[in-house]
């Protein structure tokens, strides 16, 4: 019986994701807790194998069937809108989407609509949708990283980005103008695999659901 393939995100959420999968009994020692060079890992005892990819690529692996399941942030799903099933909020790596501006600048003036502001972000679709909902026209500047530097160097007036502690904002003399959305890690599934491999995927999803519940109880104890 072929293993279930799960796509995992590189970077910040990787270590927490490995801990989560090990705690659920879906990954063995082959999947190392520290991100290394290996991008494809098999765990025979658990009947799983893992593709380790950029977070923005995880939904693509799942949507096109290269992976049966994937774990990725809600922020990525909201931006890309992939054709996958979102099965479960895993509850960890929680962060906030915020609109931020340089400290000392009146945000009401920036958002008055009298002039077209430039907004730097890694999430252009979501950013444009937000400003459209407020009836404001902005110029969205897409960046892959270092979003917080954009106002300092005159590239943008505002930024939209995800934050956990807000430390990077403070280090770059930025303040939160508004909290837009929240995000956490989600379990997604390929639509065909979810139906055709239900006898394998179903119990795995149930293990993860039970772990989410146990963690929630422990957090509130």
From Swiss-Prot:
It is found in: Cytoplasm. It is an enzyme of class 2 (transferase). It catalyses: 1-(5-phospho-beta-D-ribosyl)-ATP + diphosphate = 5-phospho-alpha-D-ribose 1-diphosphate + ATP. It comes from the Bacteria. Its EC number is 2.4.2.17. GO terms for cellular component: cytoplasm. PANTHER family: ATP PHOSPHORIBOSYLTRANSFERASE (PTHR21403:SF8), ATP PHOSPHORIBOSYLTRANSFERASE ATP-PRTASE (PTHR21403). Belongs to the ATP phosphoribosyltransferase family. Short subfamily. NCBIfam families: hisG (TIGR00070). Catalyzes the condensation of ATP and 5-phosphoribose 1-diphosphate to form N'-(5'-phosphoribosyl)-ATP (PR-ATP). Has a crucial role in the pathway because the rate of histidine biosynthesis seems to be controlled primarily by regulation of HisG enzymatic activity. This is ATP phosphoribosyltransferase. The gene is hisG.
